[in-house]
Amino acid sequence: MARLQEYYRSTVVQQLMEQFGYKSVMEVPRIRKITLNMGVGEAVADKKIMDNAVGDMQKIAGQKPVVTKARKSIATFKVRDGYPVGCMVTLRRVRMYEFLDRLVNIAIPRIRDFRGISGRSFDGRGNYNMGIKEQIIFPEIEYDKIDALRGMNITITTTAKTDAEAKALLAAFKFPFKN
C-alpha cells in the first residue's frame, strides 16, 4: 500500500469526518483518479517529438501513455484528422497515490519562483486542475537528455460534491495552496 493511501485511511478520513460532520466513512471524499495530459502540437511536423513526449510522460507517470489524435482537420494549424497531437495517462489506485506523493513532496517545491498553487482552479464539482510549464521539475526527467521543455495539465478527480470539500481533502494531503 502506498504511503499516502495509508495516511488517507488513518488520518485524513477522521479529520474530514469531524470537519464536515459525515455520518459514514463512505461519505468522505476521496481521490478517484489523476489524469496527466500533454499537448504536443509540434509533433505534426516531426514524429520524433511525439516519441520524446511519450517517453517523458512514461517516466513521470510510470505507465505507458495513450497518444491522442486530432478529431478533425484544421488547415490553419496544418493538422489533419487522425494526426497525433498529444498524449495522456490516467492513474488510479496505488500508482495514483505514489504520483501524488512525488508531486506534492518533490516536484511542486522544485518549481521556479514557487509561491504556492492557486486555490481557484476547482471546477465547481470538486475536481482540481493545474498546469505545469516544465517537465523537468520531476526527478525522473534528466535535464541533459531532454530535447525541449514541455508543459502538461494535471487533473485530480475527486468524489467530493463541493469545491470546499475537495480543497479540504487536498489540503489534508498537504497541497501547498497560496492562502
Curated annotation (Swiss-Prot):
The keyword Ribosomal protein belongs to this UniProt entry's keyword annotation: yes
One of the GO biological process terms: translation
Pfam family, one: Ribosomal_L5_C
Keyword vocabulary terms for this entry: Ribonucleoprotein, Ribosomal protein, RNA-binding, rRNA-binding, tRNA-binding
Entry superkingdom: Bacteria
GO molecular function: rRNA binding; structural constituent of ribosome; tRNA binding
Gene3D superfamilies: 3.30.1440.10
PROSITE patterns in the record: RIBOSOMAL_L5
GO cellular component: ribonucleoprotein complex; ribosome
Keyword Ribosomal protein among UniProt keywords: yes
Cited InterPro entries: Ribosomal_uL5 (IPR002132), Ribosomal_uL5_bac-type (IPR020930), Ribosomal_uL5_C (IPR031309), Ribosomal_uL5_CS (IPR020929), Ribosomal_uL5_dom_sf (IPR022803), Ribosomal_uL5_N (IPR031310)
Family the UniProt entry places it in: Belongs to the universal ribosomal protein uL5 family.
Function: This is one of the proteins that bind and probably mediate the attachment of the 5S RNA into the large ribosomal subunit, where it forms part of the central protuberance. In the 70S ribosome it contacts protein S13 of the 30S subunit (bridge B1b), connecting the 2 subunits; this bridge is implicated in subunit movement. Contacts the P site tRNA; the 5S rRNA and some of its associated proteins might help stabilize positioning of ribosome-bound tRNAs.
PANTHER family documented for this protein: 60S RIBOSOMAL PROTEIN L11-RELATED (PTHR11994)
Subunit record text: Part of the 50S ribosomal subunit; part of the 5S rRNA/L5/L18/L25 subcomplex. Contacts the 5S rRNA and the P site tRNA. Forms a bridge to the 30S subunit in the 70S ribosome.
Protein name as it appears in the record: Large ribosomal subunit protein uL5
